[in-house]
């Protein structure tokens, strides 16, 4: 089970580009906004656990 934190780097239409906090040099993860909290903005932090994202 992967548990990690992300920073929302960019919101692009129906998708958000996320950067892992613990691996900042890794490629950005593209996630459908439908899977993310509606309140996200660029620069906010997300916690991911069991494919559920929450704002931290």
Question: What kind of feature is each model-predicted range?
Answer:
Residues 26-37:
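Beta-strand/loop nucleic-acid-binding surfaces
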């Amino acid at each position: 089970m992967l548990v990690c934190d992300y920073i929302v780097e960019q919101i692009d239409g129906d998708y958000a580009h996320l950067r892992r906090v613990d691996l900042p040099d890794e490629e950005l993860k593209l996630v459908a906004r439908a899977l993310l909290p509606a309140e996200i903005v660029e620069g906010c932090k997300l916690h991911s656990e069991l494919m559920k994202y929450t704002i931290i």
